[in-house]
Amino acid sequence: MSISQVIDTSFHEEVINSRQPVLVDFWAPWCGPCRMIASTIDEIAHDYKDKLKVVKVNTDQNPTIATEYGIRSIPTVMIFINGKKVDTVVGAVPKLTLLNTLQKHLKST
């Protein structure tokens, strides 16, 4: 499954209205730690393609949604289920940390 780039105007439709759980990666092109976890996000998108939608939000180009969700540091990864934010992971964390957080919420869906 490919990762969609979501913008301020499409966030509601792509994330809030999604019937699938959604992992949202808030990032920026200049952010070194964002580039460090990019391959992890790609792997998760591939490995969970039947269970999870993965999208990216460029915070430089989409400041409205970044502000709405209180993004102060990037990368920030948020998990949404049924249109509600259920968890947040801030920083370039190990893949296992993201997977454990994700598994915790996917078990309940």
From Swiss-Prot:
One of its GO terms (cellular component) is chloroplast. Coiled coil: none annotated. Gene3D superfamilies: Glutaredoxin. The active site is at residues 31, 34. Its main location: plastid. InterPro entries: Thioredoxin (IPR005746), Thioredoxin-like_sf (IPR036249), Thioredoxin_CS (IPR017937), Thioredoxin_domain (IPR013766). The record marks 25 as: Deprotonates C-terminal active site Cys. One of its GO terms (molecular function) is protein-disulfide reductase activity. It is found in: Plastid, Chloroplast. Belongs to the thioredoxin family. Participates in various redox reactions through the reversible oxidation of its active center dithiol to a disulfide and catalyzes dithiol-disulfide exchange reactions. This is Thioredoxin. The lineage of its organism: Eukaryota, Rhodophyta, Florideophyceae, Rhodymeniophycidae, Ceramiales.
